[in-house]
Curated annotation (Swiss-Prot):
NCBIfam families: apt, PRK02304.1-3, PRK02304.1-5. This is Adenine phosphoribosyltransferase. CDD domains: PRTases_typeI. Keywords: Cytoplasm, Glycosyltransferase, Purine salvage, Transferase. Belongs to the purine/pyrimidine phosphoribosyltransferase family. Catalyzes a salvage reaction resulting in the formation of AMP, that is energically less costly than de novo synthesis.
Amino acid sequence: MMDAVRARIRDVPDFPKKGIVFKDITPVLSDPHTFREVIDAFVGRWKGERVDKVIGIESRGFIFAAPIAYALGAGFTIVRKPGKLPWETIREVYALEYGEGALELHIDAIGPGDRVLVVDDVLATGGTAGAAGRLVARQGAELLGYSFLAELSFLNGARQLGHAKVHSLLTF
């Protein structure tokens, strides 16, 4: 089922820096049939569960999270890099290969009792997704799990996400 999607993801060597093979998902997005197949697959995984909010991780997570939220009848919210959200936020810091990064969430975006799904395009090391999950927990909400278009399994990112459900449409 995902063969057409896999075929549209292209490898771009040495991007954004030498030694990295970047997974370019833009051909998936530009083809309406493939894009619909991806969204339908995401929705199919979570349709039987009560999802109150879907969080999209900046920035490509937004592309998938918004239509998933719409299809599930859930709210859509975003986590962004520091200083990009206009209202009061909470911040979660996470480790990068060289240094650290951070994500922010509006303090009123989710709350106690909300059942939350976190969505991003690619699961690599798990640092960014894990930070988003910790933001959910800090707000007293329930983390249902994570969904990704692709997982780079050789980086073992799912291990960084604890016991949460991890749903990846494709594995590389």
